[in-house]
């Protein structure tokens, strides 16, 4: 296991020796490299979340019920759809960055294809829940009128789910190659379309919440199509795309071994905040509206892993952009077996976000009385927001640090640890404490955020301790597997073993009591074949890496499609039966 001193040379100079011991050598250069990478990603995330902010602003000025409906609709879509897809696709952060840093760059295209297939399958069970939005919300004692409007929004949003998944996947495909500006351009296009669509559908045609949902769908399609066309027309795929390959149907096991922990790492945290929204809905429309406004404030200041409104409470733009940048830099360095650079990127990213989050947290506290006016005219909501924002400003500092550590974990392929930490801190500590303070102590929305503050503080401590003891050399070895380098080597050895002779050399060798026996030996420049190897040994050496046959692929992938389709049919059946009663 490599210590900080073993892996990253430290700069002991300067006027503050104690501080310099924490700063790796080359910190300044690495910090600017991270900012150059994360800067466009920051803009991209701002533009992406602006779509939801604009929609919320339009609906917020329609009334409390409309604002609450949009908030719940987006929360429901997040919990039951976007969070799952974004979590599973986060495996691509590990696989794509490490593959692009390795000599096997074409493997990035295979990962893109594999990820697209997996995410499309995920849409089917998510849609099953979307069909029953109103009934689920009523089970949680949500307001009937709010639940009805929420169902309208979610039903309209159904075709937008695979579009969001594809857009997220294309963005990861580019950013893990250090290509960032096309995402910004697509975000500009999406926001322009969204602004015009919201004005036309909500303000002019008076379609209300339904108009906002239609505007959201239109803008999602516009920016996704633009990004896809940009990649093709500018030929950004040439270095990593070798065409459609049946290999994307192989190796789903290793993909899910990263995808499931990635999903849990994100979703257990994401769901905790969405549960907070549902809890606020149990209190009053004012508390729920205040929660929505705080989420939006968080969107502008923090922004984390995904593309949706309600996730904004624990997401802040700059930390998210820096987290992605750290993930890319760490993953590419490990793919190239450069552990020194990988750890330098990790340490530099964490130190940078500490300073940035302190500045942002201070600004939030200073502007606590002004921020609420941006999103609503309701004085009760504005007053409640101003009370909670000081707590959120402290929360933001620790959550921002956790966000960047999440990038380190994704870059190293250690999402399983992140999932475990989030599950414990949010569901065993944070949420129970928040519920206790909210409903028993009667602190209402303030109690929820105090519970979340305790949660992120403990999570930060766990991430710091874990990464300080991380074995970076082992992580580099694992990166070889993720990037397909070991499989390539094994296939090359297998092919060399099975190939015919490159040339024959006749020689006389003495074999025991029979001197002068002439044997023909075969040799290749890259390997030497032992003619005396037993059949079992030869089979062991020449056996290719585990690949499924065509029959096995049809059975297994067909079973996956059948299971996903069956889930959708169950959801449709439940909706029909529930509607009749």
From Swiss-Prot:
Region (Disordered): 481-513
Origin: domain of life: Eukaryota
GO MF term (any one): organic cation transmembrane transporter activity
Membrane topology annotation: Multi-pass membrane protein
Assigned keywords, A-Z: Antiport, Cell membrane, Membrane, Transmembrane, Transmembrane helix, Transport
Catalytic activity, as annotated: thiamine(out) + H(+)(in) = thiamine(in) + H(+)(out); estrone 3-sulfate(in) + H(+)(out) = estrone 3-sulfate(out) + H(+)(in); creatinine(in) + H(+)(out) = creatinine(out) + H(+)(in)
GO annotation, biological process: organic cation transport; xenobiotic detoxification by transmembrane export across the plasma membrane
Chain ranges passing through the membrane: 34-54, 67-87, 120-140, 154-174, 184-204, 213-233, 254-273, 318-338, 347-367, 381-401, 421-441, 445-465, 558-578
Subcellular location per the Swiss-Prot or TrEMBL entry: Cell membrane; Apical cell membrane
Ranges of the Extracellular topological domain: 55-66, 141-153, 205-212, 274-317, 368-380, 442-444, 579-581
Chief site of localization: membrane
InterPro entries for this protein: MATE_euk, MATE_fam
GO cellular component assignments: apical plasma membrane; plasma membrane
Segments on the Cytoplasmic face: 1-33, 88-119, 175-183, 234-253, 339-346, 402-420, 466-557
NCBIfam families noted in UniProt: matE
Function: Multidrug efflux pump that functions as a H(+)/organic cation antiporter. Mediates the efflux of cationic compounds, such as the model cations, tetraethylammonium (TEA) and 1-methyl-4-phenylpyridinium (MPP+), the platinum-based drug oxaliplatin or weak bases that are positively charged at physiological pH, cimetidine or the antidiabetic drug metformin. Mediates the efflux of the endogenous compounds creatinine, thiamine and estrone-3-sulfate. Plays a physiological role in the excretion of drugs, toxins and endogenous metabolites through the kidney.
Family membership noted in the UniProt record: Belongs to the multi antimicrobial extrusion (MATE) (TC 2.A.66.1) family.
Protein name as annotated: Multidrug and toxin extrusion protein 2
Gene (name only): SLC47A2
